[in-house]
UniProtKB/Swiss-Prot annotation:
[2Fe-2S] cluster binds at residues 3, 6, 18, 25. The lineage of its organism: Bacteria, Pseudomonadati, Pseudomonadota, Gammaproteobacteria, Alteromonadales. Its cofactor is [2Fe-2S] cluster; hybrid [4Fe-2O-2S] cluster. Belongs to the HCP family. It comes from Shewanella woodyi (strain ATCC 51908 / MS32). GO terms for cellular component: cytoplasm. GO terms for molecular function: 2 iron, 2 sulfur cluster binding; hydroxylamine reductase activity; metal ion binding; peroxidase activity. This is Hydroxylamine reductase. It is found in: Cytoplasm. Its main location: cytoplasm.
Amino acid sequence: MFCIQCEQTIRTPAGNGCSYSQGMCGKLAETSDLQDLLIYILQGVSAYAVKAREFNIIDAEIDTFVPKAFFATLTNVNFDDARLIEYVEQANTYRTRLKDAYEAQCAANGVMVAEMSAPAQLVLATAKPELLAQAPLAAPNRGDVHEDILGLRLLCLYGLKGAAAYMEHARVLDQTDAEVAGSFHEIMAFLGEDSVDVDKLFATSMEIGQLNYKVMAMLDEGETNAFGHPEPTQVNTVAVKGKAILVSGHDMVDLELILKQTEGKGINVFTHGEMLPALAYPEFKKYPHLVGNYGSAWQNQQKEFANFPGAVVMTSNCIIDPNVGNYSDRIFTRSIVGWPGVTHLVGDDFTQVIEKALALDGFIYDEIPHLITIGFARNALMAAAPAVIENVKNGSIKHFFLVGGCDGDKADRSYFTDIATQAPDDSLILTLGCGKYKFNKLEFGDINGIPRLLDIGQCNDSYSAIQLAIALSEAFECEINELPLSLVLSWFEQKAIVVLLTLLSLGVKNIRTGPTPPAFLTENLLNILEEKFGLRNTTTVEADLNTILNVA
């Protein structure tokens, strides 16, 4: 086992990364090894997808499978070895299908078959012990390479993994694009070649950022086409009396299915974590039994799910061990999510969830409502832009902070609470991702009717923040980096990595990230990123605010 993809990975003077019998996330070594092997075979699938495209062979089924299966290896998604082996076997079938199609076209056209990469050629074993024996070939730190080369490879690998997750979220909303899929395959195939070309690897990281910008636009279009444009909305965040289902993750299509299937059954539905923004979409407001948001960010789920007196559905990341809170018999997984022994739902029938919710007590009384305001995504931000611009011009608004990203359980993440609460009263704070839970239930007031705290939405809704920044730069006839805008991003896993690459690829500079740098980035690479982009780690709130606000 070697895994270094998330913030909680082991860090020691001897080296970084989880490499023992179990990772810090709870992932067993065998599970980690199977994930590595899956990625390796997927790189082989992509290698043949690239070659097949030379003959205009585009297999839409494979184009959607590869990012979906890749998503299953993201932090806190799938811990189920049996399911991972199914993905490996399916990937191998698809690899053979593309190989046969490509070689047939070569023969028909009198073209030599190309020499393929190792992931394209590996003869896959058929049983778990033999698959695990092959896993070292696929380890992310395979080979004897300089640590900077390895760091760049992993930056690309984890960034592309984040993009794959967003591609799958978009696909669920019927948003696919053959050109985007082709670019994805090209990068995936390249990473399977184990390049040692520093310039090419760095350029690829920027290509991943550009690719993800397109994917986020697709996802934005898919969500707004399906559910309307989010609008400022007050949301209750405490218990409501009655039977209950909690929906976590990111998949709003699953949420809609659950709402439709629970109509008239006396069950209240709550969102959790990154599903909170769903409550701002007009299409969901027609369901009176969607009563609010329960709980906070992913790392608190073992306590929050244990206390929730109903059924829980995990539609995507993040899942952690449900046995700790003794609720494994009432949590259900969907799509790419998996945990051994937990019921996995295939298809669109949520009867098992409904029956479980009806059999449980539910909340026995209403709590006094506690309301927060959400829904400041792209359309709402654009509608507010004229008022924001006017308040900048008259001096009422002097600075913008984007404070968001992934949450986590490290104590020093209190930094993000503190920088939001200590930001000057003449500043606006935009937030997104589950990092918002560090402060989204606090009161920030307003500036001439404009709320100081603007909740943009899920982590992928950084697309909305980018659109606002572009609009402001056009209004003030300046570059984005000349705006009084500071980005302070909390990172935990691979979606945050690809959002960062997206921003860097768009030329956004002077971003602060924290609380700790990714363990796979060497000191040399961090220095290069700071020199090239002004990217730096957070320090103290006082020092960072002084620098941001140019206080001597």
